[in-house]
Amino acid sequence: MKASELFFPTLREVPSEAEVLSHQLLLRAGFIRKATAGVYSYLPLANRVLKKIMNIVREEMDRAGGQEVILPIIQPAELWKKSGRWEVYGDEMFRLKDRHNRDFALGPTHEEIITTLVDADVHSYRHLPLLLYQIQNKYRDEIRPRFGLMRGREFIMKDLYSFDIDEEGLDISYHKMYEAYNRIFQRLKLQYRVVEADSGAIGGNESHEFMVLAENGEAEIVYCKNCDYGANTEKAVCSLEEPKVTEEEQLELEKVHTPGQRTIQDLVDYMNIPKEKQIKTLIYYADEELVAAIVRGDRELNEIKFKNVLGCNQLFMADETAVKQLCSAGFGSLGPVGLPLKTYIDLEVSQMKNFACGANEDDYHFINVNLGRDFTPAGINDIRNAVAGDSCPVCSAPLYSMRGIEVGHIFKLGTKYSEVLEANYLDQKGQEKPMVMGCYGIGISRTMAAAVEQSADENGIVWPLPITPFEVIIVPVNSKNEEQMQAAWSLYEEFKQEGLETIVDDRDERAGVKFKDADLIGIPLRITIGPRSLQEKQVEVKKRSDKDIELVPLDAVSSRVKLMLKEMSK
């Protein structure tokens, strides 16, 4: 292919709206262009990458027994209301009405549609198990679309749904998908880790995330080097450690004047009370009810865990106006003593004695607060974020942390949807039973962005070989030089015969511009044809991931390039 005919408008400057590396580089390298907030056009280079990702995904889904379908993007509200998720999804769901004033949604996911589809035509155990998948655009009305393809309002996903007769069958389907996902990300040549995860709005009782590792990853995961345990911080179990001081005498509750002291650090500085001897009191709306969550002063509340404990649909922090109306004190002066709310404390807080907290009065704190004597919580639960250094819940070894990007998520749904949507089958005894389901998603467009985040350098993208838009770029230094162009097209034809995906940069540009664009786009191998090397019947061969340049005789270029690509594919 000729670069002069390829639509890839590159940019020299970093676009001001691009916050993360993948967003910057995909814009600069001419892979994507923004249509509106969170919605992007995929240009030819991106389309080539996406197709390669999709092909690998399709091959592994087919290998695992999946059958591809195409499901509707526009979904009737009745199905979502029947499942109970019309309200659960809240403002994240795009909703629309037709000319008859009937409600519809742009599908953020397809559990309702696929369950109804299968229910209509599958009635016997003889037709199960069944694995159906699609690769489709999905839509979520993110409150703040950010980070390019990482958090958009329109995105490309593969989702597969499994239908089995029982939990044992689901275990088999789940294991098939678990192994298929591992093969997919291994074939994509991405460094990744599988971690336990929360099921979120999808529901279900077991799930795993496949996280591409990246320094700038959006999510933090914790893992154990001593065993196979790993989880994202939404799911990671925080184990209770034995208290260092098993017996500590309860001291008398005391109210102290703390003018202007509103933060945990303020109290450390003002009264020399360590963070570990303080608590944070956070007020939330759980649907429409105000509740309080309490964690140790040096910890962070895990909102996902807290939401799961409460079993609510919506959880969001109360504003300071609502808090002041409740207890006449603002943020930084709150505490559980006398607080007229249901209060939930983290497990760690249940071990604390003689700790400090706000007195529900501005500029005052309590010290020597004790559970039971001074307040009684509505619940004691694991509601904090796990951090590096915590004990592994499996083997008690210390946990480590790293950052990653979620690109795959698999769920055991059980009968969550089949029961409410009445997707039943007749078993061998003629008894009607609900199908047992699983759900398995991969973010296709997100995987492309994650690959950029993981491998890019200061010069641009460095594509893994399996998903690069082209394998080789041939760069004649002077496109007006007939000898250089003749050598370029001769090599191109050789590579074409060998099945290598090649592009010739025949543009009338300076050599420096061509080199910068080649690095920016991230093609694995660059062959440079210049006057000096050509005079010696040689060309320069350079890997995108290396700085070294290798001089290769013209008659050996094809074999050398094939060998280099073979080595890169290992």
Curated annotation (Swiss-Prot):
Keyword Metal-binding set for record: no
Entry-linked Pfam families: HGTP_anticodon (PF03129), tRNA-synt_2b (PF00587), tRNA_edit (PF04073)
Subunit-structure text: Homodimer.
Protein name: Proline--tRNA ligase
Record's comment describing the protein's domains: Consists of three domains: the N-terminal catalytic domain, the editing domain and the C-terminal anticodon-binding domain.
Top-level class of the enzyme under EC nomenclature: ligase
Keyword Flavoprotein: no
Molecular-function annotations in GO: aminoacyl-tRNA deacylase activity; ATP binding; catalytic activity, acting on a protein; proline-tRNA ligase activity; transferase activity
Organism field: Syntrophomonas wolfei subsp. wolfei (strain DSM 2245B / Goettingen)
Described purpose of this protein according to its UniProt entry: Catalyzes the attachment of proline to tRNA(Pro) in a two-step reaction: proline is first activated by ATP to form Pro-AMP and then transferred to the acceptor end of tRNA(Pro). As ProRS can inadvertently accommodate and process non-cognate amino acids such as alanine and cysteine, to avoid such errors it has two additional distinct editing activities against alanine. One activity is designated as 'pretransfer' editing and involves the tRNA(Pro)-independent hydrolysis of activated Ala-AMP.
A single GO BP: prolyl-tRNA aminoacylation
Gene3D superfamilies per the UniProt record, alphabetical: Anticodon-binding domain, Bira Bifunctional Protein, Domain 2
